[in-house]
A protein has these predicted regions:
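Nucleotide-sugar donor-binding catalytic core of glycosyltransferases
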Residues: 1-110, 116, 148-162, 166
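Residues at or immediately preceding the N-termini of alpha-helices
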Residues: 58, 120-123, 132-135, 152
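Catalytic phosphate/metal-binding cores of nucleic-acid and nucleotide-processing enzymes, i.e., regions
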Residues: 62, 95, 120-123, 142
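Short amphipathic alpha-helical surface patches that serve as generic macromolecular interface elements
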Residues: 81, 111, 120-124, 139
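Conserved acidic donor-binding segment of nucleotide-sugar-dependent glycosyltransferases
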Residues: 113-120, 129-130
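Alpha-helical elements of Rossmann-like donor-binding domains used by nucleotide-donor carbohydrate transfer enzymes
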Residues: 122-126, 141, 154-162
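Conserved donor-nucleotide binding/catalytic region of nucleotide-linked donor-dependent transferases
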Residues: 125-145
Length: 166
């Protein structure tokens, strides 16, 4: 896990950095108020033109995410998003919300790779039950899953495995 931050080095408990660019995203992301329960929550809304510019470069975005323990996953234009893969690869434990599709060839397992909440009201209690040791275990599970499924070598090996099983 070279280059990944330890528990102590992560200064952000929970994060969501995303935006709303169309009515579908607005409907999926703005129904509930997640900003009160996520420590660093940024979701500028611009439906139509001009589209809001990203506040952060890709490197700045990934640096902020890498400083986080947990990352909120909200559905966007569709049920799948790159955000989950970014979180898993950086060892950030995803917080899945209703409408997020987390089905993969190798299934993610609740309370092993991610936590699930149905509403903002559940977030604090769920996060408070995860101590340093449990978070480290979950974070390592996330990184291992990413390496097996999404890293260049892992995704190649997985593709070969799937083809061989056809």
């Amino acid at each position: 896990n070279k280059g990944l931050k330890s528990y102590k080095e992560r200064k952000i408990k929970s994060i969501f950095l995303g935006k709303v660019e169309n009515p579908v995203q607005f409907n999926n992301r703005a129904k509930l108020n997640w900003s009160d329960v996520i420590d660093l929550f940024e979701m500028p809304i611009s439906q139509g033109y001009p589209v809001a510019k990203y506040k952060y470069t890709q490197d700045e975005y990934l640096e902020l995410v890498s400083q986080s323990l947990f990352g909120l996953c909200l559905p966007g234009y569709g049920p799948k998003c790159n955000r989950e893969i970014e979180l898993l690869g950086l060892g950030v434990v995803p917080i899945f919300t209703p409408g997020v599709d987390n089905t993969y060839y190798e299934p993610l397992i609740e309370n092993k790779h991610y936590i699930k909440v149905n509403s903002p009201e559940e977030v604090k209690n769920k996060l408070d039950t995860i101590n340093k040791n449990k978070w480290e275990e979950m974070s390592n599970n996330c990184i291992s899953w990413y390496n097996r499924n999404c890293s260049p070598k892992g995704s190649f090996d997985l593709t070969i495995k799937i083809i061989n099983n056809i």
